[in-house]
């Protein structure tokens, strides 16, 4: 029902938004010179298209009036020359339009991809991947057509139409006026049918985008597994089939609308030609015009109604292209909520500590970070977000470990996400450095900050690539020997030895060909290659069996040597050795201290410790 309501409401705009066309022209600035050349070629081509019927009429006159064979031969040669010139111009036009179109696709894709990469994590937590991919592919290609077929067609048809009418009036103004009488019968239905076809095309595009989103989610390893585990293949197939059936029905309606449209136009054009032959023949018999003029007018009439047909339907093409541009510009107009300062301060090449000073934080509202069309909802919700961190003060010195414990939803992962600046605080500050030399993370560059901080989550992400490819994501220049060393340090040496393809083994999407423990250790090996000075472990051993947990814990111990660490853990046994343990509840730090100190204090940590180990007993 939601998709149906979206399809009905998401119609083509009735008018062009102000500033869209100038913005498109500015975006194509790199292609302006080639565009001017392209327009010049189309103008010459239009002149040739009008010239051939005139020459054909002169051939008829030369034959009827018996002015000489040489005249006929010269005119025929001129027609042949124009045909060759038109063919060569057509090749040149095609080459230039392809260069412009493909260049525009390249520019748009680079711009959208780069812009999306700069968006904060909050954007990706809300956006449906398939919809975003559709913007990068389908809409970019739709925008490209505006500078190839649509633009060239408009220019060629307008020039050809003007020249054709001018030449026809010169040849026989009476017949030209009669031919133009049929224009209202021609144009009005064309505009009406054009709107119908445009609406059908847009609805089809929306349904195709929805199917792309469904396939993207269901064909991932995790999505496919979930579908099978819940016995939903049939339901998914029916949902997909329903959308595909609607696309099929729309396709049939569009094809029939196009056919009715073209049949009507062909009929009107045929009636006009019959009128030209009838009236023109009568005028020729009475000696008012030459027989060749009648032939020229009849041929020119095809040059008149052909462009009119395309121009009558041009609104559909233009509006479709503008819709594509608008959908691309929608993404480009989303402002990244996290930006770098132009005068970013470089971080010192020394061990780094982390400090949070009176940090308050609220997750951003959906309307500030996303688009309803990218989430495939009718409208974004406008709920009042509540503050999730309230005056948090924490500090971990260089080389020490800070552990965050507390119930689920207390704010531990939120604190961890603020350190690499995946979000910005509302007030207060997150700083890195050491006593006497602290730097607000908003004052340094993303590359500098994230090069100094490594993160291992409970569900480390791996790309559909080889083991080597995933590891080199952290250090592209790493040698095979360095990769092997990192794998051994992450306790994956035995696995590597057992794999026939070794480093060239493909891990599958999200690493699904590996076990949970192997995936975690591979992400740890990747972190070891990056060699960060600060390591954040967000429940890195959660959901692992005992044997895998032991192996991962050994790998983590290796990874933390000589590094500052912020560790989030539900299993208190894994953080006994932490220099500082902070208990987080309801977005506040309610206790801090070492394991022994907090137990002796008999506060919230002692309660958590007693509950966990009493339950284990």
Each language-model region and where it sits:
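Juxtamembrane loop-to-helix connectors within ABC transporter transmembrane domains
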Residues: 19-20, 28-31, 38, 93, ...
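Cytoplasmic coupling helices
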Residues: 95-114, 128, 152-156, 179-221, ...
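Transmembrane helices of ABC transporter permease
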Residues: 30, 34-44, 149-203, 276-293, ...
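ABC-type nucleotide-binding domain
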Residues: 348-617
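Helix-loop-helix
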Residues: 63-74, 167-181, 257-326, 331-332
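Transmembrane helix-loop-helix hairpins at lipid-water interfaces of multipass membrane proteins
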Residues: 29, 35-89, 169-174, 274, ...
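Membrane-integrated ABC transporters
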Residues: 1-49, 64, 68-75, 93-97, ...
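An intracellular "coupling" helix at the cytosolic face of ABC transporter transmembrane type-1 domains
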Residues: 25, 29-33, 121-122, 138-147, ...
């Amino acid at each position: 029902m939601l998709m149906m309501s979206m399809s009905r409401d998401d119609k083509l705009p009735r008018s062009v938004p102000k500033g869209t066309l100038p913005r498109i022209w500015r975006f194509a600035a790199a292609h302006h010179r080639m565009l001017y050349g392209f327009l010049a070629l189309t103008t010459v081509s239009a002149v040739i298209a009008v010239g051939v019927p005139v020459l054909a009429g002169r051939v008829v006159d030369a034959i009827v009036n018996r002015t000489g064979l040489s005249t006929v031969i010269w005119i025929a040669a001129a027609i042949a020359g124009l045909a060759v010139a038109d063919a060569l111009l057509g090749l040149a036009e095609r080459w230039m339009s392809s260069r412009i179109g493909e260049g525009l696709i390249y520019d748009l894709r680079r711009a959208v991809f780069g812009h999306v990469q700069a968006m904060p994590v909050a954007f990706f937590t809300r956006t449906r991947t398939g919809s975003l991919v559709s913007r990068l592919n389908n809409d970019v290609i739709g925008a490209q057509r505006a500078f190839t077929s649509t633009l060239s067609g408009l220019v060629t048809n307008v020039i050809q139409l003007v020249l054709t009418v001018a030449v026809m009036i010169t040849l026989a103004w009476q017949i030209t006026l009669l031919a133009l009488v049929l224009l209202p019968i021609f144009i009005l239905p064309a505009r009406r049918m054009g709107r119908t076809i445009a609406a059908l095309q847009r609805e089809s595009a929306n349904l195709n985008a929805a199917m792309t989103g469904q396939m993207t989610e269901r064909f991932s390893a995790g999505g496919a597994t979930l579908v099978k585990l819940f016995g939903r293949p049939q339901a998914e197939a029916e949902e997909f089939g329903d959308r595909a059936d609607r696309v099929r029905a729309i396709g049939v309606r569009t094809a029939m609308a196009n056919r009715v449209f073209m049949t009507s136009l062909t009929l009107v054009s045929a009636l006009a030609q019959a009128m030209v032959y009838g009236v023109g023949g009568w005028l020729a018999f009475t000696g008012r015009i030459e027989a060749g003029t009648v032939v020229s007018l009849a041929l020119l009439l095809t040059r008149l109604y052909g462009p009119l047909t395309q121009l009558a339907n041009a609104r559909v093409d233009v509006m479709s292209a503008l819709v594509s541009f608008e959908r691309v510009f929608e993404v480009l107009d989303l402002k990244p909520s996290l930006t770098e300062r132009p005068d970013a301060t470089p971080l010192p090449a020394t061990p780094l500590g982390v400090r949070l000073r009176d940090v308050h934080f609220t997750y951003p509202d959906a309307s500030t970070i996303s688009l309803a069309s990218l989430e495939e909802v009718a409208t974004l919700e406008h709920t009042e977000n509540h503050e999730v961190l309230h005056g948090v003060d924490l500090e971990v010195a260089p080389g020490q470990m800070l552990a965050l414990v507390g119930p689920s939803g207390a704010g531990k992962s939120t604190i961890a996400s603020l350190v690499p600046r995946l979000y910005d605080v509302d007030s207060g500050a997150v700083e890195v450095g050491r006593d006497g030399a602290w730097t607000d993370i908003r004052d340094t560059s993303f590359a500098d900050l994230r090069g100094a901080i490594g993160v291992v989550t409970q569900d480390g992400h791996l790309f559909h690539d080889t083991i080597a490819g995933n590891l080199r994501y952290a250090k592209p220049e790493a040698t095979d020997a360095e990769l092997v060393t990192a794998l051994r340090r992450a306790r994956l040496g035995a696995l590597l030895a057992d794999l026939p393809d070794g480093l060239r083994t493909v891990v599958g999407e999200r690493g699904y060909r590996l076990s949970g423990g192997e995936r975690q250790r591979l992400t740890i090996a990747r972190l070891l290659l990056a060699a960060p000075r600060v390591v954040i472990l967000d429940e890195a051993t959660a959901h692992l069996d005992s044997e895998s947990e032991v192996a991962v814990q050994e790998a983590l111990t290796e990874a933390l040597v000589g590094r500052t660490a912020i560790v989030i853990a539900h299993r208190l046994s894994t953080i006994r050795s932490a220099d500082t343990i902070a208990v987080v509840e309801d977005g506040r730090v309610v206790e801090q201290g070492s394991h022994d100190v907090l137990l002796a204090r008999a506060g919230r940590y002692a309660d958590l410790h007693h509950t966990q180990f009493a339950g284990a007993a």
